[in-house]
Amino acid sequence: QLFWDAEVYASFVERARRAGVTIPIVPGLLPATDPARLRRVQDLTGIEVPEQLLTTLAGFEEQERRDEFGAAFGSRLIHSVLDAGAPGVHLYTFNKAKPVLDILALMGVTPDPQWSPASHPFTHH
């Protein structure tokens, strides 16, 4: 479930639980680094992107500043939903890994240097 506000996610989960839904509800986060992309996602999904978020992003002339803002915004949002009891977070890359990696780095999540695709238990040979 894509969202832009931790309260929206928490409210959705609360309503779902009252309706008898017992499965995990994993919040989805799209890194906020490109206002045009966010508008397209809004048009496709009907999920409103806060105007203040779009305005803030549009105010940065350099993509590097948008990326920094998006990583900070994303990490705060992730911390908020995890604090609210989310079982995890789904990060949407839409074929752009860097913004997701920036969020993870800001949160202190780093790749395991010992991991390789060949050693992964789900790799088929």
Per-range role (PLM):
Residues N95, T110-H125:
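Extended, intrinsically disordered, low-complexity segments
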Residues P27, V89:
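Conserved, mostly hydrophobic/aromatic
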Residues L2-G20, K96-L106:
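Active-site-adjacent beta->alpha loops and helix N-cap segments on the catalytic face
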Residues G28-A84:
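Catalytic-face loop-and-helix region of soluble metabolic enzyme cores
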Residues R17-T22, A84, T110-Q114:
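Short helix-capping segments at alpha-helix termini
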Residues P35-R37, L77, H90, A97-D102:
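Short active-site-adjacent structural elements
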Residues A16-R17, Q42-G46, M107-V109:
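Short, hinge-like loop/turn segments at secondary-structure boundaries
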Residues F3, L29-A36, T93-K96:
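Glycine-rich beta-alpha junction loops
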